[in-house]
């Protein structure tokens, strides 16, 4: 009799659009992984702060900070890799939606860190979600990059 591992913490609808492999393979890896994607971090949150919070759920293999691909400075996300899936499930259950550095962090399953994914995918080097942000968010560098460069209005007029 074969059994299918079903996570006790449900998978979200988010999928990495740059995943190298089939949708089926990505789903399989997400159900087995002990790696988490952590989003909505302040640009000033340190690896030590992340370690202090996430180590409450278990032993951490490594933390990979998300970096602006041009400046090599933190850009609001990271990957936390645990030794055990159960510890990652605890972090999903108990840390997702809590505050770190006065921000509500988003914790999601990740199919496994691959070199290069630590860099932001936005045109300006950071995260895509920060490119077009029109609100002023001090913890994420102020206004979105397009607003800072005065391009948002021009882009909207051209549409």
Curated annotation (Swiss-Prot):
PROSITE patterns: RRM (PS50102). Signal peptide: none annotated. It is found in: Nucleus. MRNA binds at residues 14, 37, 106-110, 117-121, 127-128. Its main location: nucleus. GO terms for biological process: mRNA cis splicing, via spliceosome; regulatory ncRNA-mediated gene silencing. GO terms for molecular function: RNA cap binding. Component of the cap-binding complex (CBC), which binds co-transcriptionally to the 5' cap of pre-mRNAs and is involved in various processes such as pre-mRNA splicing and RNA-mediated gene silencing (RNAi). The CBC complex is involved in miRNA-mediated RNA interference and is required for primary microRNAs (miRNAs) processing. Also involved in innate immunity via the short interfering RNAs (siRNAs) processing machinery by restricting the viral RNA production. Belongs to the RRM NCBP2 family. This is Nuclear cap-binding protein subunit 2. The lineage of its organism: Eukaryota, Metazoa, Ecdysozoa, Arthropoda, Hexapoda. The gene is Cbp20.
């Amino acid at each position: 009799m074969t059994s299918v591992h079903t996570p006790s913490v449900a998978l979200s609808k988010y999928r990495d659009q740059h995943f190298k492999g089939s949708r089926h393979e990505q789903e399989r890896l997400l159900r087995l992984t002990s790696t988490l994607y952590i989003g909505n971090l302040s640009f000033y949150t340190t690896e030590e702060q992340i370690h202090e919070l996430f180590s409450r759920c278990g032993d951490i293999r490594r933390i990979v900070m998300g970096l602006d691909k041009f400046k090599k400075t933190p850009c609001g996300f990271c990957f936390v890799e645990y030794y055990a899936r159960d510890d990652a499930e605890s972090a999903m259950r108990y840390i997702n939606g809590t505050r770190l550095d006065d921000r509500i962090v988003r914790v999601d399953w990740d199919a496994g860190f691959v070199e290069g994914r630590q860099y932001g995918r936005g045109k300006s080097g950071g995260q895509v979600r920060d490119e077009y942000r029109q609100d002023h968010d001090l913890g994420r560098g102020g206004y979105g990059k397009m607003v800072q460069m005065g391009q948002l209005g021009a882009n909207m007029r051209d549409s």
